[in-house]
Structure formats: C-alpha cells, structure tokens
Amino acid sequence: MKRSVPLEKAAEVVCDQSAIPPLIFQLPPEQGREVLERAQDTPVYLYPVDICAQKINTGKWGMIPVYFVTPTCHEPVRNVIFYIHGAGWVFGSFHTHEKLVRELAARTHCLVVFPEYSRSPEAKYPTAIEQCYFILAHLWQITNKQYPQLNHHTLTVAGDSVGGNMAIAMALMAKRRGGPCIQKELLYYPVTNNCFNTPSYQRFACDYYLYRAGMQWFWEQYMPFEAGNPITATPLQANMKALKGMPKTMIINGQADVLRSEGEAFGEKLRWAGVDVTAIQVQGTIHDFVMLNALDQTNACRTAMDASTAWINRENQ
C-alpha cells in the first residue's frame, strides 16, 4: 500500500498486519486483549531486572496488582518512575509493556512502579485514575519497607498513549489534592483531547495502525456520557491556571500518528503556562512505537528510548 508518509519497514509491516479485518477495536474487549497479548509474545531483548508484584487495596476503587521493577545490581535504587500503561484504556497489561518497563528501570537505575489498573468498559472513568492516584499518594508508605532509601524529590510519572493521558491526570490531581510532589512527567504520544478532526487525525485516520474510528471507540468505552470533559481526561482543555506549576515534561510523538497534533499542542500549551517542556517528533513511525516488541529495534524506538532515559538521568542528578 502506498502511504503519504514513508515509514520504517518494520512500521510498514505493523500497519499492514493491523489492517487485516477484523480490526482490534471491532472485536469484543476480551478478544482484543488476547490479540495484543499474543502480539507482544514476539521475541525481544528483555533487560535483566528484578520484578515483584503485590495486590493493593485502593479502597472503594478495589484491589489491583502493582508491579515493582528494579535493575539487577547491588546498588540500591533511589529514584522512582510511576508508569501507567497505554492501549486504549481497554487493552494492555504488564506483559504488553514489560520490555519497555524493563528498559526504563535498567537504563535509568530507577524503581519502576507499574499499576495494573481496572480496564474499560468494565471500569469507566474515573476508576482507573483514582486507583492509580491512590497508589501514587501512598507510594512512600507502600515502598518504605523494601526501598527505604528512595528520594521523595525526584518522582517521575510516565506513560504511553492513554497511559500518558493518565500520567497527566496524576500531576493535575496531585496539584489539586496537595501531593505528592512530582518532579517530572514523561509522555510517549499522549492522548490529551477528544477532538477527532485535528490535522493528524485527518491525515492518518486509517491505514497507520491507530485508526480514528479506533480512538473514538476507545473514548466511548472509557468515558461515561454524563462525565463531560473533565481536564483529568482532556487536559488540553485545561486553562493556564490549572497547568501552571506542572512538572517538567518530556513529550515524544510519532510522525504518522493520529494523536500527534494534540500531543504537540499540549506541549505548546504547557510552555505558555511556564512549564519546562522538551518535545520531540520522531519521523517515519506510528503510534505505540516504543511499546510494540516488533518495533523495538527501529530507529524510532531506539531514538526515543535514548532520549527519554537520558532526560530522566539528567534530571535525577
């Protein structure tokens, strides 16, 4: 298929494979989850790390598994990345994001805390962000026994796609609720709005892996109609007062992604609010390019991982 943007070969293959009907968002949620889980069985290099998991009660929001990932070394970790996974609020798990989380932990020498929040449509907004915020707000109590040496002043919230959306929500909720103190946020191609007629939505509406119709379906699964457009779901609609004082932010977007316009617009709006922003657009790639095992060795993924881990390491010094 001839596309208007030249992609790396591996990204072309992913686009072609994902275009075979039925599309993942046309399946019942459980079947779609299985499709992504199987796709992420693709062999890939996994950085050596130590992983432990526990179920944590988030009060009225229920029990969720939380994974704690540390680099395999003798030196104690001092910094934390609180990572929220993407995949449309409907799909995704620790397995689908394991290679990404392992690399972040190993290359930044951080403890990565990974909540496996309740997914939609079974759990609607704001369940997932409330679960994540509960873990974040109680992070130091939860980790103190096993990791007493953690630095409370270098906390990073991070996420990809809708996980980036929820990472932004964590920063907004922490501002509104008085903590915890978040130093920085790392956002890979984040969802920041529910507007489907942006330039990137129009240009990449289909045939580029993430379809406009797919994003519309994801939003329908996640947001109750009566919820409206709260800024913890649509942060691009936040005013300057709400965005002022947000953490230092890195935003990495892919060129051929329906979400690119809103990700870039959010970075610009943060700058207008006085926030320290580093923004990168990676050419020749598609949505999910840092998450998908099949794209791990592409120039796009390696560039994004080099840039983001270097940024975290620099800011943690």
Where are these regions (language model features)?
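Short amphipathic alpha-helix adjacent to the substrate-entry channel of hydrolases
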Residues: 95-114
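Gly/Ser-rich "nucleophile elbow"/oxyanion-hole loop immediately N-terminal to the catalytic nucleophile
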Residues: 141-157
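Alpha/beta-hydrolase active-site loop
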Residues: 123-146
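Active-site glycine-rich loops that stabilize anionic/oxyanionic intermediates
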Residues: 85-90, 256
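A glycine/proline-hinged amphipathic helix-loop "lid/cap" segment
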Residues: 1-71, 228, 299, 317
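Gly/Ala-rich beta-loop-alpha elbow adjacent to hydrolase catalytic centers
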Residues: 159, 163, 167
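Proline/glycine-enriched tight loop/beta-turn segments at coil->beta junctions
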Residues: 62-64, 71-80, 243-246
